[in-house]
Amino acid sequence: MITRLGLIDYGMGNLRSVQIAFERLHKALHIVRQPADLSRCDALILPGVGAFDPAMVHLEQTRLVPDLKSWVKGGRPLLGICLGLQLLFESSDEGNATGLGLLKGHVQRLPSNQGERIPHMGWAALEHRNDCPLLDKEDPDSWMYFVHSYAAVPSQNSDLAAIAPFGRDNITAMVWKGRLGACQFHPEKSAAAGERMLRRWLNWLETGAKPVP
């Protein structure tokens, strides 16, 4: 059973809104600012708001990057949110920094020829692609709140858990591999549907966190 959750603070995350969301689920989060803080945690949350390059610089300054890579490669659970999803990939159109590289693929700027405003702000429905413990195909209310200008393009289709419409095309909404998952949207700002998703993540953790291939 996994009971101790860590929220990574590297200076570019929407920490308070995530904390409030988990407080509603009666779950306290331990703030992680340095490697020593990881000893108190069984699972991690990597939030993020802002640009890719500054985020990686801030994350490097915490000295957490090697530990985060070891954490995920060791099969321990981590959930990324918004920019936190993008940082899991190898690189981004938004800058020249190297991402964490925990998922293969590149983050691209949203296309300007789709008749949609950029940044993409608002609600969109999820369409399931591959198995993910955060998703419930029987849940009719799967609209989530997005705020972003970039979207990840996974190299491996098996890592793509859900997509969402953007103009005439679709974008990556969720990824999942093993015990590593992430949302491009903000579940903590997605009302009841987002709360149900976070509750499913907690239930998955508390029942053994079985990895998804």
From Swiss-Prot:
Q: How does it assemble?
A: Heterodimer of HisH and HisF.
Among InterPro entries, the record links this protein to: Class_I_gatase-like, GATASE, Imidazole-glycPsynth_HisH
Return the Pfam families for the record: GATase
Query: EC number(s) in its UniProt entry?
Result: 4.3.2.10, 3.5.1.2
Q: Where in the cell is it found?
A: Cytoplasm
User: How is this protein named in the record?
Assistant: Imidazole glycerol phosphate synthase subunit HisH 2
Q: Name one GO biological process term.
A: L-histidine biosynthetic process
Tell me which UniProt keywords the record has, alphabetically.
Answer: Amino-acid biosynthesis, Cytoplasm, Glutamine amidotransferase, Histidine biosynthesis, Hydrolase, Lyase
Q: Which reaction does it catalyse?
A: 5-[(5-phospho-1-deoxy-D-ribulos-1-ylimino)methylamino]-1-(5-phospho-beta-D-ribosyl)imidazole-4-carboxamide + L-glutamine = D-erythro-1-(imidazol-4-yl)glycerol 3-phosphate + 5-amino-1-(5-phospho-beta-D-ribosyl)imidazole-4-carboxamide + L-glutamate + H(+); L-glutamine + H2O = L-glutamate + NH4(+)
> What gene name does this entry carry?
hisH2
Entry annotation: catalytic residues: 82 (nucleophile), 186, 188
Q: Which residues form the Glutamine amidotransferase type-1 domain?
A: 4-211
> What does the function comment of this entry state?
IGPS catalyzes the conversion of PRFAR and glutamine to IGP, AICAR and glutamate. The HisH subunit provides the glutamine amidotransferase activity that produces the ammonia necessary to HisF for the synthesis of IGP and AICAR.
Reading the lineage from the top rank, the first entry is: Bacteria
Q: In which pathway does it act?
A: Amino-acid biosynthesis; L-histidine biosynthesis; L-histidine from 5-phospho-alpha-D-ribose 1-diphosphate: step 5/9
The record's disulfide annotation reads none
Molecular functions (GO terms): glutaminase activity; imidazoleglycerol-phosphate synthase activity; lyase activity
User: What does UniProt give as GO cellular component?
Assistant: cytoplasm
Q: What are the transmembrane regions?
A: none
